[in-house]
């Protein structure tokens, strides 16, 4: 079932992508990203998603047990358990958990990385250089700026793993950080990212679990589903991302579209 779901989902996404790409999408994407991404690809976001997915597949044994990964060693049980504190921001509790976080990371990550850019901006202009060309600053080359995107995402994940209250698990703190950065710097594009992320998650759920059955069970009351959500980690990630976005706008002397940001946050 897992293989069939993955094949169908990949086929649907490939078909939609091919349709858009061959009907003017390629030219529009090149025009949009020519001075923002190296070869038009958000490398930093893709690298982060690939590494987190690899952690789920190999460290958590998700490749062998997709729906029932290894989780207990990676939970941030306590500050006296450093392994959990360091890994909780990258581990996930289920297939749906990682799919949801990775689709969100991809959708918002593209927007955030576009706002950051692989090429430095000075006085409203983009300075384009080759990927590994010598730079006046070690952080101004495209290669370094790409790695900074991945490093920033991982830093927020680690931060939320350290300061979240109670046992935690998941990359969602970093996803909310990426979203906060994207909403502040590119609010309209962030709204489109919400739609894209929701559409991908809905498509995956429809393929993975097309039939939903409701049952009535007899027993003692149980906590609601939202009781297991680390709201404080989400909020911390969002605030850190938003502050980073404000700092970037201030450094570039760009204006903050406060009204648009307000409605994008809603």
Question: Across the structure, where does each feature detected by a protein language model lie?
Answer:
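A detector for small-residue-rich transmembrane helices and their helix-helix packing motifs
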Residues: 2-266
């Amino acid at each position: 079932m897992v293989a069939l779901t993955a094949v169908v989902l990949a086929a649907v996404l490939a078909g939609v992508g091919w349709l858009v790409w061959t009907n003017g999408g390629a030219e529009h994407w090149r025009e949009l990203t020519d001075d923002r991404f190296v070869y038009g690809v958000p490398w930093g976001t893709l690298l982060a998603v690939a590494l987190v997915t690899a952690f789920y597949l190999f460290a958590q044994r998700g490749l062998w047990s997709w729906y029932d990964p290894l989780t207990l060693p990676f939970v941030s049980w306590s500050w006296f358990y450093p392994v959990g504190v360091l890994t909780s921001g990258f581990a996930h509790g289920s297939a749906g958990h990682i799919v949801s976080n990775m689709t969100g990371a991809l959708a918002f990550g593209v927007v955030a990385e576009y706002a950051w850019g692989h090429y430095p901006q000075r006085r409203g202009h983009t300075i384009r250089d080759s990927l590994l060309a010598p730079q006046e600053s070690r952080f101004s080359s495209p290669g370094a700026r790409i790695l900074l995107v991945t490093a920033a995402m991982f830093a927020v994940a680690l931060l939320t793993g350290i300061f979240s209250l109670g046992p935690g698990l998941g990359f969602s703190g970093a996803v909310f950080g990426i979203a906060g950065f994207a909403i502040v710097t590119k609010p309209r594009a962030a709204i489109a990212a919400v739609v894209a992320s929701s559409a991908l998650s809905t498509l995956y759920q429809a393929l993975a679990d097309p039939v939903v059955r409701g049952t009535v069970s007899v027993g003692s009351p149980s906590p609601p589903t939202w009781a297991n959500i680390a709201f404080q980690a989400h909020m911390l990630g969002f605030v850190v991302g938003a502050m980073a976005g404000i700092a970037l706008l201030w450094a570039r002397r760009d204006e903050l579209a406060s009204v648009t940001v307000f409605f994008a946050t809603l």
